[in-house]
A protein has these predicted regions:
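Non-catalytic helical tethers at domain boundaries
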Residues: 1-140
């Protein structure tokens, strides 16, 4: 007997939509200069949950995009990088790309590869710059 996981897609899509809405609200209310550790943990958990579900269903663009976001959020919550407004703006932009990817997967379409590549490159630059200790504002 083979399990058809497509029957669980709608549940994943609904949960991912809720997690993205929660992530957006937390990011919009985040005090960049002194972020609440609980808020950072909640934002990280939202990204982590979306990534896990996306990987389970084989939504590779969503998995890959969320993985990079998650790694930056993990470093932020572990005090391994200092958040900047540019980072939070990039996280919000990523949330929009993830929302678009969900819409595409829900419609059985492939997500916009160029949009994913653009946001992933931006996140990777932020990740590299924060690892090097250079100001994130230099990325603009």
């Amino acid at each position: 007997m083979t399990l058809d996981i497509t029957q669980f897609y709608q549940t994943f899509f609904d949960e991912a939509d809720e997690l993205l809405a929660q992530m957006e609200q937390l990011l919009l209310n985040l005090d960049v200069g002194s972020p609440d550790p609980e808020d950072l943990a909640a934002i990280f958990r939202a990204a982590h949950s979306i990534k896990g579900g996306a990987a389970t269903f084989g939504f590779s663009a969503l998995t890959d995009t969320t993985h990079i976001l998650e790694s930056l959020l993990d470093r932020a919550r572990n005090h391994e990088l200092t958040l900047t407004k540019e980072m939070v703006d990039a996280f919000l932009e990523t949330k929009d790309v993830l929302s678009d990817q969900l819409v595409d997967y829900r419609a059985s379409a492939e997500p916009d590869a160029a949009a994913a590549a653009t946001i992933c490159a931006k996140l990777e630059r932020l990740k590299a710059e924060s690892a090097a200790g250079a100001p994130a504002a230099a990325l603009r």
